[in-house]
Amino acid sequence: AYRIDHVLGFFRIWEIPVHSVHGLLGQFAPALAMSREEIESYGLHFQEDRFTRPFITDWVLDRMFHERAGEVKEKYLDRLDEERYQMKPEVDTQRKVEALFADVADEKELWLRDGLYALISDVLFVRDHTNPGVFHPRISAQLDFIYESLYDNDKAAFNRLYNDYFYRRNNQFWYQEAMKKLP
């Protein structure tokens, strides 16, 4: 016996990139990605580099890693600009971090690994897997530091965009796609 929670689940799948360990950087397929213009129509000035690159700053590192923030900067990060850091190339994906910590059993080191995973997924938007010129809001982005860093009016604009994307725009699209396939 099968239980069907929602019929639209048959017409979409959550795709997780091969470079990810966790699903936060995934996207539905098929899905209607958003252009820069569509994002900005919600009142959110789209800063592509800031919103699609992991949001790593001194205050983020201090809050996440506490007394180990300096160690994280030295071992795993390069300076990107005056405000931000970026992951070193050898740890710039969750899979690379996973491989680096593959033989580690120490709880403190696993905590560090999990923090690095979280840094990598701290983005507001993910690029579409097939068309990198369009974007999807990152699922649950409101729980991350990039969202916290936004002004209140930008948070409100992102929330409108997010709710429309996940609860209207794509539901209608999936319904229309389902109607083409169902008798």
Name every feature range the model reports, one short phrase each.
Residues A1-P183:
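Catalytic cores of glycan-processing enzymes that make or break glycosidic bonds
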